Amino acid sequence: MNRHSLAPRCALALGTIVASAMAGAGPALAQQSASSYHVASKVKLGREGGWDYLIVDTAGHRLFMSRGTHTLVIDTRTDSVVGDIADTPGVHGIAFAYDLSRGYTSNGRDSSVTVFDLKTLAPITRIHTTGVNPDAIVYDDFSHRVFAFNGRSGDATAIDAATNTVAGMIPLGGKPEFAVVDGKGTLWVNVEDKSEIAQLDTKTLAVKAHWALAPCEEPSGLALDRASRRLFTVCSNKLMAIVDADNGKVVATLPTGDGTDAAGFDPATRLAFASNGEGTLTVVHEDSPNTAHVVQTVPTQRGARTMALDPQSHVVYAVTADFGPPPAPTADRPRPRPPMIPDSFTLLVIKP
């Protein structure tokens, strides 16, 4: 995902999407949650750096967020800062391997992956990915591998989580964005510049399929309903596409807001989410595997295009900042971005 240190195009689509034992929850929960999402609080975090992916550590009740050169950790019970992982240069994404009690960050600036202790946050080692500018990163507990998706080299690096060594490289034929796994050996990743989803085997590292996503353009965020085998991908042309995870067929599309960049899915409520840079959160209900409808458009704040979902509390987290007026255009920068106002970085807590 592209990230600007001042006005980021952040794609957190949702961190690890986990199936829940609550997936059979009744329609009353979905109806109540869908109709009442709102920004319950805004927490000013300040500090330096832009931002990119967010991910919720459900076991530790923490929210991890990339901040340009460091990775900030928030206690989701108090919304306060409880840790900061230093020296993650150009950090984009964060992933967790609960079975190993380890976490991982993808560091775009030096094309590396930092391995850290998930409990203490202490760094363990740094792995050079052999790809250029790792962006999204996910852990697959089926193969016990970490997958880092390299934006500039158009490939993925598979890392053996037990040994912290590179297990292989996977050419993707384009710029990868977010990815999800099903826990059974299959991984899906958006290929942004090709408007495709690639399907991978996490054991053999073979690319099994490339699926065109038309009418979806430039997909970024991606989420998965493991029960219905449906992918939710969000697109730059204000669409969410629902895709059959087994054959790649686009079964439905729904409108989102401008600047859509991140996606999430709550298995308990069957709600899918798209966070939009215009300052809205689109909430979609999955009625059946092939039908869905928009149930709410939640006002958030301009720039809040990256998000994470806590599937236990059903809370959505987004981040943004305040921005000043854009500088005057130049030949080199005909459309300059507005600068972020120092110390204005803010966490939005969006509750049902």
Where are these regions (language model features)?
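Bacterial N-terminal signal peptides
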Residues: 11-24
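Bacterial N-terminal signal peptides that target proteins for export
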Residues: 2-14
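Intrinsically disordered and other compositionally biased segments
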Residues: 6, 20-21, 149
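Predominantly soluble domains enriched in secretory-pathway, periplasmic, or organellar proteins
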Residues: 24-352
